[in-house]
Amino acid sequence: MSGTILLTGANGSAALWTVRYLLQHHLDKHLILTVRDTSDSDANTNLLREALAEYPKASFSIRPLDLSSLAVVHEFAKTLVDEVSAGKVPKLESIISNAFYWNLVSAIEMTNDGYEKTSQVNHIAHSVLVLRLLGSFSENGGRIVLFTSDTHWPGKSPLEKIKPMIPANLDELAKPPPDEPEDHMAHGQNRYALSKLAILMWMYALNRHLQKSPRFANITAVAINPGNLSDSRALRVNTPAMIQMMSKYIIRPLRPLLRFTDPTMRTSSEAGTDIAKLAVNEACPGYRGFLTLLKEDTSSPDSLNETVQEDIWVKTLEWAGISAAAAGISD
């Protein structure tokens, strides 16, 4: 058994293809696959089980993980650290922070931790996992795969009504003011875009801190824009009827044509395969930074501000309830 790959949101549209690729080409990996609902009543989790059932020699576990509760995330990480220390599972080779949340149809949602839900699920909770689990990586290093999107760049999303700009008061990323005016789609899309911008900027800071550490210098972090996935279930969850209709009658059937105007338009299977290749260092070996699909790319000018990157790094530690020292990394 060569190493453990942790994948959040493992029953997602692209994630199912990530799992399939790993099973087909890296059956020696131990997969820890997290989902919100592990019950048989969840159709998407059953699709994951069906994929796994095709490989009776696969080594895996499907585990529940509610990213909207930081207490649950901390406990999950502690359990995994203990399992690795005890030799019950192999050391980590990769963390794939795939799970995400957005809501374009209702007012701002706050978690019991007091943070806006999109920000917590997409960024804060995944930062907890990464920071708590750094010490469980192999001495040879590994890879952290984070997810951003073209929405981080002002003007690139057709759904954008409010530009994604890091607020002067960083606490507003996690605790934004009420939606004014009450345009749920505009504000929901903006919260999603800001979470992707925060992830991207945190990734740059994370890499700098990893490189300063003799213990973690061989761990590389990437933030990938996986593309606009024409068949993603995300287009049909917490989205207005207009987007759902566009997904069904325009985006999916016309994908080959739309690709001429948007080269990042592709299927979940294409994205999921690329994500798997990144996780095992087949793609872009040793690279740290931003990717569009599997192309090394330059992110938005705003995202490259190193001062703000470090400010987000410090604030994320605070939100996550973790000190740099506890993570074993320089502050």
Predicted regions and their residues:
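Glycine/proline-rich active-site loop of Rossmann-fold NAD(P)-dependent oxidoreductases
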Residues: 213-217, 234, 238, 282-287
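Residues at helix-coil transition
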Residues: 24, 82, 279-283, 321
